[in-house]
Every structure is written in structure tokens, then in C-alpha cells.
Amino acid sequence: MIKFCVRLVQRWLPEPFIFAILLTFVAALVAMPLCHQTPLEVVEHWGGGVWNLLAFAMQMALVLVCGSALAAAPVVKRAIDAMARVPKSAPAAIALVTVVSALCCWLNWGFGLIVGVIFAKAIARQRADVDYRLLIASAYSGFVVWHAGISGSIPLTMATPGDSLAMATNGALTDPVPLAQTILNWHNLVMVLFVIIGITVANTLMHPKQGALTIDPALLKDNDSMATEVSASVTKTPAQRLEQSKLLSWLVALMLVAYLVIHLGLRGAGLDLGGVIMIFLALGLMLHPTPVEYVRAFGKATTGAAGIILQFPFYAGIMGIITGVGVSGISLGGVLADACIRISNPVTYPLLTFLCAAVLNMFVPSGGGHWAVQAPVMFTAGANLAVDPGLTGMAIAWGDAWTNLIQPFWALPALAIARLDAKDIMGYCLIDLLITGVIICAGLLIWAI
């Protein structure tokens, strides 16, 4: 089964950019007959959405670059390498990477997505007997719990008071839904626990006893060697003194920390993606020897963001096709949601909502996109069926996160750091998809009863 999935993906999964192009054509071809849209309307929806994720694309690029630059700081590299020496066998290394990544992603998806892969690379430097592809796949598999965690965009949006909640749900939700009914609901927490256990056991068992694809640790050290040697010569010019002034780095870092304390501590705001970037940036500035050293590390890390910069506009265009409404008054996302509603009852509704979100996620891999597409339809239908709105929201959230395991879009930062192709890890992730799918479906059915 494992070999079959790995070979299937390696044979048929194209480069992520080609995958995005194919998804664009599939969405367009499906939207025309189902939504009665002309090719011109579809092109207009696509073109109108292409630039809608520019700010988010910049954030994702900064998460990758700032996280990588932070990992290149000498003190951070020493700490990560010390942790990487803890596992005493290849299966133990796989298990540790999976658990660390999942817990970090549950706390904050941007933080976990980067830290998990950096930790996996550190283990690969320490252990020459671990399968590198499976190690990186294990780090990425922890991402499946992100939307059930405390940085999940849909449950956080549902918990935010204001008129926008009623507008987004067509009046189905007028009062905010507290986190105790979504992320912190015991059903959800048990599902998270079983999912983490499931992927940890699965990833550990998938490690081959023979024929593991390993990588020369020296290659990883060369690739990670972002920091350059500080010149031993005495600085003579004012410019050189400024470039090597630790004071400048610390002043800027302290400004970032002060803002975070005010924003998170005093005002009680949540830690969003911008906050994660600020933390990475502040720590990077403080932990690199000099400002110019950080600039050089940042510049070398930037090359890994090419895939993100190129592909985000295409997925934004796909989102435009999915959400675009033509003269018929319906969108492709609405058609899929309506089909789900027609065959549902109060018990199966959360499960079918989850599956609907999972399919949509292949075309719109964004929590915000899911909220825009499904919230107006699914919460209204859920209210008519007397389904708990917290359960409806978490069904959408789990569906959004689940198929990320086989959607290369979110793997781009991890693949850039690991210097692998999507086809190298997606075969293992396909196994995790099947296992977690059973766990999540069972959990949603039990929650609905």
C-alpha cells in the first residue's frame, strides 16, 4: 500500500505550478455548465481574483524567509541540533518530528509549518539512517490539525462580534460563537488528539526497514550555511561600524517586541500571521551577530520563496472562479454547497459539510476563501436542520485542513526549505490522508449524535 501510493504520486503528480494550472482549467470547465457561465464570464472572474491574495502572498513569503533566516542564527542552530540528537533511532525521529510539528501547528499554523521542517532537517543532519522524504512528509503532516487549533481562521472569525458575522452568514449567526463551542470543545480536542496519534503511528510504521532514501548530512549543512563569517579586520568607516552595530538590531527588535506586548497583552488581540512574522523578525535581528549578517541570511533565504510568489496569484484566480457569480446568480461554490445540503440530515450534515469543504479546498486552499464560499449557505442550512453552529464551523475547518495533505499549495514553504519536490512527500501524505479521514469522519458523526 505504501509503495503503491508513493509510486502513484511520483508518476502522476506534476510540479506544483503545473498542478495549479490544471486546477484552473478544471474549475473553469466545471463552472461553465454548472453555473451557466460563458467563457468570457469565467475569464473575468479568474482575472478579477488573480491579485486578491497579494497581501497574503507577501505574508507567506515572509513567514518562510524570516523563519529560515532565524534558523540560520548560530544560537538557534545549536539549540535545534541539540534537540535533534534526542531520538536514538529512525522511527523515533519520525515520531518526534510528527508530534512537534502537529503541536506547533495547533498553536499557530505559520509557526508550526516552518519550525517542523527546520527541525526535520536538523534531525537529518544528525541521523544518516532516516528516510529524508518521509521525515519532511512527517513534518508537513502535522499541518492537518491547524484549523482545529487556536490560530484557526474560521472559528476565530465566528468568535468575533460585529455585524460582519451576520452579513457573512446571511443572518444565520447574529451572536458570536465562543471558542468553547469550537476549538476548545471536548469533541474537537479529542479529534485533534486521535489525529496526532494516528499520523504519528502511521508515519513511524511507514519508515522502511531497508532501502531508506537518505541524504548526505554534509549537503544539508552546506545548504543551511546562511551565516557568513564576520570580518576579523578592524572596521574603519562609519558605514562599516553601522553594519556591525548590534545596538541597531536590538533597537528595532525591541520596537517589534513592544508592539507585540501592547497588541497581544494589553489589548488582548489574537496572535495572527503578522504577529508570527514579527516574532521571527525580532528574534532573527537579536540572535544574529550583526545587522549585516541578518541581511545576508535573509537574502539567501529569499530564493526559497519563488514558488509562493509565482503560484499564489493562480490560486487567487481559481478562488475567483469558485466564488464568481454570473448572470445566473449562482457560483460554483454555491452549487457544491447546495448539492451537499439536499442529501443531508441533522446527523450527516456535518460530515457532508466536511467533505464539501475538503473538495473545495483543492481549488480554494484558504480558510478565508472557505468562509466566503460556504458561510452564507452552510450556516443557514445548518440552522434549518438545528445543527450546532459550532459543529458546522468546525466541519468546514476540518475539511479545509484535511485535503491540505495532498494539496501542494501549503507544502510550498516546507518544500522550499527542504529542497524537495511535492511528489517526494505526497505519497506518504496520501496514506495520512486516508487514516485521518476515517478519524475525522467518525469524530464528526459522534459529535453530531
Description of each model-found segment:
Residues M1-C5, T38-W46, A71-P87, A122-Y132, ...:
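Flexible loop linkers connecting adjacent transmembrane helices
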Residues M1-V65, L184-I197, V201-Q311, I431-L434, ...:
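Hydrophobic transmembrane alpha-helices of multi-pass small-molecule transporters
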Residues I18-I21, A57, I94-L96, I136, ...:
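Hydrophobic alpha-helical transmembrane segments
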Residues M32, F56, M60, S68-A73, ...:
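Transmembrane alpha-helical segments of multi-pass membrane transport proteins and ion-pumping complexes
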Residues L53-S164, F363:
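Early transmembrane hairpin of solute transport permeases
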Residues V86-F119, I309-G326, A337-T380, N384-L385:
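Hydrophobic alpha-helical transmembrane segments of multi-pass integral membrane proteins
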Residues A90-C105, D129-S153, T157, N170-A180, ...:
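Alpha-helical transmembrane segments of multi-pass membrane proteins
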Residues F119-T214, W410-G443:
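Membrane-core helix-loop-helix motifs of multi-pass transport proteins
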